[in-house]
Amino acid sequence: MLKNLFRKTKYITVSQKNIENYKRENTPTIPDGMWVKCNKCGEILYQNDLEKNYMVCNLCGNHFRIGVKERIKYLFDKDTFKEWDYKIKTENPLDFKGYDEKIEHIKEKTNLSEAVTTGKGKIAGMEAVVCIMDSKFMMGSMGCVVGEKITRAIERAIKLRLPVIIFTASGGARMQEGILSLMQMAKVSSALAKLDEEGLLYICVLTDPTTGGVTASFAMLGDIILAEPDALIGFAGKRVIEQTINEKLPEDFQKSEFLLEHGFIDKIVPRSDLRKVLAKLINMHQNSF
C-alpha cells in the first residue's frame, strides 16, 4: 500500500519535433513584408496603407526612402515614362579589386543597371526629362556611368527643348573609380551650364540622403531647388565637421528644414504634393515664353 502511495507518477513524453509541429500548425501565417516599422516614431505600419500614402508614415510624417519604380509611379502620367541609356555598362577603369563582382551582385539584388535612371515622361500632360538616383545601388554613388547618363539626358533635353528634373539620392563620388568619378561633377555641371544658356528649366529635388560630390555639384545648381521633409543634405558628415572645427553643430544641421531656413533651398515639398508642384512650375515656365 505504502509502496503504491509513493510510486512515481507516469507522464507522457512529447518530442521536440511534435512541439515544433504544433507551433507551426497553430501559429497564424503572416506573409513577409506585410508590416513595416517606422524608423522615426516606431509605429508598425501596414505596407499597403504605406504605399497608398506615398511611403510616408501617416502618424509622424516620416518619408521612407523610395526607389526608381516608386518615384516613376508617383510622378508621371501612367505609361508615359520611357527609359534612356539603360544598356550602358559599368566598367572597372582602375581594376579595383572586387568591384566587378560587387556591381554584378548589386544588379541582381536591386534589378537596376546603375545608380541613376534617366528618361522622358509626362507630368500632368507636360513632357519633361527626368533623372532619378536610387540609393539602393551602391548608396547612389556617382561613377562614370552615372555622370554619362545624366549628361546625355541633359543634352537630349536641349535638343528636345524640354525641362530637366533631377532627383538626387547619393552618398557622393564612387571611390572605386577614383578621379574619373570626381570628373563627373564638372562634366554634369558643364552640361547644365549649356542648358541654362538655352533658357531651359532645371529643377533639382533633394531627397534623403544627398551628400558628397553630388551636393557639391549638380544638386545645388537648380534654377529651383526643392527638397523632401527631413532629408539629409550636406557635403561632409556631421561628425567629420565637428572633429575638424572642434565645435558642436546644431541637432538639425544638414536637414532640409535647416537648409531652407538658411536660404540654401527654395521649398520643402511633401511627397504627396510633389507631382502637383512640379507640374505647376513646368507650366509657369512654359507660359513665360
UniProtKB/Swiss-Prot annotation:
Pathway: Lipid metabolism; malonyl-CoA biosynthesis; malonyl-CoA from acetyl-CoA: step 1/1. GO terms for biological process: fatty acid biosynthetic process; malonyl-CoA biosynthetic process. The keyword Lipid biosynthesis applies. One of its GO terms (molecular function) is acetyl-CoA carboxylase activity. The keyword Amino-acid biosynthesis does not apply. Binds 1 zinc ion per subunit. It catalyses: N(6)-carboxybiotinyl-L-lysyl-[protein] + acetyl-CoA = N(6)-biotinyl-L-lysyl-[protein] + malonyl-CoA. GO terms for cellular component: acetyl-CoA carboxylase complex. Keywords: ATP-binding, Cytoplasm, Fatty acid biosynthesis, Fatty acid metabolism, Lipid biosynthesis, Lipid metabolism, Metal-binding, Nucleotide-binding, Transferase, Zinc, Zinc-finger. Its EC number is 2.1.3.15. It holds the Pfam family Carboxyl_trans. Residues 34-289 form the CoA carboxyltransferase N-terminal domain. Zn(2+) binds at C38, C41, C57, C60. It is found in: Cytoplasm. SUPFAM superfamilies: ClpP/crotonase. Its cofactor is Zn(2+). InterPro entries: AcCoA_carboxyl_beta, Acetyl_CoA_COase_Trfase_b_su, ClpP/crotonase-like_dom_sf, COA_CT_N, Znf-ACC. It is an enzyme of class 2 (transferase). A zinc finger (C4-type) spans 38-60. HAMAP family: AcetylCoA_CT_beta (MF_01395). PANTHER family: ACETYL-COENZYME A CARBOXYLASE CARBOXYL TRANSFERASE SUBUNIT BETA, CHLOROPLASTIC (PTHR42995:SF5). Component of the acetyl coenzyme A carboxylase (ACC) complex. Biotin carboxylase (BC) catalyzes the carboxylation of biotin on its carrier protein (BCCP) and then the CO(2) group is transferred by the transcarboxylase to acetyl-CoA to form malonyl-CoA. Belongs to the AccD/PCCB family. Acetyl-CoA carboxylase is a heterohexamer composed of biotin carboxyl carrier protein (AccB), biotin carboxylase (AccC) and two subunits each of ACCase subunit alpha (AccA) and ACCase subunit beta (AccD). This is Acetyl-coenzyme A carboxylase carboxyl transferase subunit beta. The gene is accD.
